Amino acid sequence: MVFEGHLVGTGLKVGVVVGRFNEFITSKLLGGALDGLKRHGVEESDIDVAWVPGAFEIPLIAKKMASSGKYDAVITLGTVIRGATTHYDYVCNEVAKGVASLSLQMDIPVIFGVLTTETIEQAIERAGTKAGNKGYESAVAAIEMAHLSKQWA
């Protein structure tokens, strides 16, 4: 038997957690995610967005959303750009571990849509220019995974 997720979002309720730090990028990721959800049939009234200060704060609110029982999937969006210190490494590692841990603990998909880039240019490319919009891609993944995970509910 082959299991596949559908790309029709009708009837799904989705939570989105967005880091405000680097908002000029994260707002584009959010725009892409909202576009992806709506294009695939998720009603605007079925999408809740929570803004948090930065990427490091994403896992806590994602956990609260995922454990609320209100959502079929949670999308996490943020942007961490390497600077001159090791802060980048700590933030990237902890956010990735936090979201990955939630994906395994919760009964719903928690999608990792946090950009971890070396440069501002790379972040811009992934927020809607050369490399597509990772927010949009995260939305499509959330829809597919929500349907796929329900096959074992």
Swiss-Prot record:
Pathway(s) served: Cofactor biosynthesis; riboflavin biosynthesis; riboflavin from 2-hydroxy-3-oxobutyl phosphate and 5-amino-6-(D-ribitylamino)uracil: step 1/2
Reactions catalysed, as given in the entry: (2S)-2-hydroxy-3-oxobutyl phosphate + 5-amino-6-(D-ribitylamino)uracil = 6,7-dimethyl-8-(1-D-ribityl)lumazine + phosphate + 2 H2O + H(+)
CDD domains reported in the protein's UniProt record: Lumazine_synthase-I
Binding site for (2S)-2-hydroxy-3-oxobutyl phosphate: A84, T85, R126
InterPro entries (alphabetical): LS, LS/RS, LS/RS_sf
Residue ranges crossing the lipid bilayer per the database entry: none
Catalytic residues identified in the record: H87
A GO biological process held by the record: riboflavin biosynthetic process
EC category name: transferase
Family annotation (SUPFAM superfamilies): Lumazine synthase
Residues binding 5-amino-6-(D-ribitylamino)uracil, per UniProt: F21, A55, F56, E57, T79, V80, I81, F112
Keywords: Riboflavin biosynthesis, Transferase
One term under GO cellular component: cytosol
Protein EC: 2.5.1.78
GO molecular function: 6,7-dimethyl-8-ribityllumazine synthase activity
Gene3D superfamilies associated with the record: Lumazine/riboflavin synthase
Family stated for the protein in its record: Belongs to the DMRL synthase family.
Subunit record text: Forms an icosahedral capsid composed of 60 subunits, arranged as a dodecamer of pentamers.
Primary role: Catalyzes the formation of 6,7-dimethyl-8-ribityllumazine by condensation of 5-amino-6-(D-ribitylamino)uracil with 3,4-dihydroxy-2-butanone 4-phosphate. This is the penultimate step in the biosynthesis of riboflavin.
HAMAP family: Lumazine_synth
Protein name: 6,7-dimethyl-8-ribityllumazine synthase
Species for this entry: Bacillus cereus (strain B4264)
Gene that encodes the chain: ribH
